[in-house]
Each structure stands twice: as C-alpha cells, then as structure tokens.
C-alpha cells in the first residue's frame, strides 16, 4: 500500500461534469472523468480499458461507482468499487461499502460503510 509510482493517477480528463451540471441517470465513461457537479445514477467504466474517475470537493454522486482508478474528495452515496486503486482525499464522504485492491485514505476522509478488500483473486462481480 506504499507504492506511489504504481498507483499514479492519470491526469488526462476526457469528460467533465461541470459544477452547475446535474445528470439524472447512469453514466458510462472511458478514459478520464472529472465530476464537479451532481450525478443521480450509477457511474461506471464503459469498457475493459482502465479508466479514472475524479470526484472534486464539490462533486456529488448518488449511485454505485465503479472504475479502475478513483480519486474522491466529494460525496458519494452508494457502493464504490475500484479494480485497481482508490484515493480518498480529506473532504471525501462515502455512505456505502467500499471495494478496493489498494486504498489511500487522507486524514479527514469519512466512510460510513464496510471496507471490503478484493485482493488479487477476488471475483469481478464482488460488488
């Protein structure tokens, strides 16, 4: 869990949900997604290519979240599942279970739910 180089987050953003944007319904993405607004629905990778989700301090997702790499500094109400790496920054608030292989949690981040380690041999449909 001390592998900074292996867990480096790709800074490339292909899709931006702006601060004044609200999406009702599921969102499927590929590449990099940054959420500054609100999403009421599930957010997941579109295909098998590893993708990155960044939820900013003012961003909010009400629904399940699934991506290879996830950085959260906002609020999620729902299960969060990462097939590779999750970083919870200081203002992260998660109400729901967190499924992870590698987790970095900053001081101040809050999880109201279970932490479930997926490990290397965990089934893909664990969440």
Predicted regions, residues:
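Intrinsically disordered, low-complexity terminal regions
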Residues: 1-62, 71, 77, 84-127
């Amino acid at each position: 869990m001390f592998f900074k180089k292996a867990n480096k987050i790709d800074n490339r953003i292909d899709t931006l949900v702006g601060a004044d944007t609200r999406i009702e319904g599921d969102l499927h993405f590929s590449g990099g997604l940054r959420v500054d607004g609100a999403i009421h629905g599930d957010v997941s990778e579109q295909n098998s290519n590893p993708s990155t989700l960044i939820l900013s301090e003012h961003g909010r997702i009400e629904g399940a979240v699934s991506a290879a790499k996830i950085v959260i500094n906002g609020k999620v109400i729902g299960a969060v599942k990462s097939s590779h790496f999750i970083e919870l920054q200081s203002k992260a608030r998660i109400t729901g279970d967190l499924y992870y292989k590698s987790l970095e949690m900053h001081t101040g981040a809050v999880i109201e739910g279970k932490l479930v380690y997926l490990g290397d041999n965990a089934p893909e449909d664990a969440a």
